[in-house]
């Protein structure tokens, strides 16, 4: 999938959400994530890594999954587009009923690890194997 398609899906979406994971810390892209969310006015939830996005920001809806809060989980479940950035989408995020995870959403996952992108649990509609630094460079040129 090319980055232009991601841009178009974000623009078309009525209820998008960014789900950011530990990959943001590993790739040292907190600043890029913050700019991307602000520039596009996108709701954001985080996985286990509660330190990757400021919890005082108006676009932050909390954590998602079994360790998350109600609002964070609602935002994901009722989204029509989930942009997963650097998250494994493990069982604590998706629950044991992973087929119901964001069931009405188009899911785009950006991860450097092909094994995480190709797990047989979550339905990922668009898989982008790419370092998050490169992803943010490319997407920010388009949006």
Residue ranges with predicted function:
Residues 2, 31, 38-39, 97, ...:
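Serine/threonine-rich low-complexity intrinsically disordered regions
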């Amino acid at each position: 999938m090319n980055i232009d398609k991601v841009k178009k899906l974000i623009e078309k979406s009525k209820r998008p959400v960014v789900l950011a994971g530990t990959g943001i810390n590993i790739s040292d892209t907190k600043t890029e994530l913050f700019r991307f969310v602000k520039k596009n006015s996108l709701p954001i939830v985080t996985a286990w890594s509660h330190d990757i996005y400021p919890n005082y920001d108006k676009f932050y809806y909390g954590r998602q999954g079994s360790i998350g809060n109600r609002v964070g989980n609602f935002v994901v479940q009722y989204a029509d587009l989930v942009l997963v950035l650097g998250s494994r989408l493990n069982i604590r995020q998706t629950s044991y009923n992973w087929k119901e995870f964001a069931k009405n959403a188009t899911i785009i996952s950006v991860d450097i690890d092909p094994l995480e992108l190709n797990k047989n649990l979550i339905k990922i509609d668009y898989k982008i194997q790419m370092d998050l630094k490169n992803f943010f460079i490319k997407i920010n040129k388009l949006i």
